[in-house]
């Protein structure tokens, strides 16, 4: 069971790319007064900390098949991001089983 993730949740970072945040695109469902994340929500682009200092973005790719928010899959802690990163933060009060 993982927590439901919300706007500005941090990611874990991957390889030489540091952690960044995920940006909510929907504004109808909230946890703790903060918009929850759904499939396709973008990360703030992040830049490698070593040469060639490439910058890339990515979008959330939720694993749940049971929980939907505004018609899209809900994002939870440990869900992958298309660039290889992972969602690393979530609500401590709302969980997806």
Swiss-Prot record:
Fe cation binds at residues 14, 46, 56, 83. InterPro entries: PAAR_motif (IPR008727). Keywords: Iron, Metal-binding, Virion. GO terms for molecular function: lysozyme activity; metal ion binding; peptidoglycan beta-N-acetylmuramidase activity. The keyword Metal-binding applies. Its cofactor is Fe cation. It is found in: Virion. Pfam families: PAAR_motif. It comes from the Viruses. One of its GO terms (cellular component) is virus tail, baseplate. Heteromultimer with gp27 trimer and gp5 trimer; this interaction forms the tail lysozyme complex that creates an extension of the tail tube. Part of the baseplate macromolecular complex which consists of gp5, gp5.4, gp27 (central spike complex); gp6, gp25, gp53 (inner baseplate); gp7, gp8 (intermediate baseplate); gp9, gp10, gp11, gp12 (peripheral); gp48 and gp54 (proximal region of the tail tube). Baseplate central spike complex-associated protein. Makes the tip of the central spike which probably punctures the host outer membrane, a necessary step for viral DNA ejection into the host cell. This is Baseplate puncturing device gp5.4. It comes from Enterobacteria phage T4. The gene is 5.4.
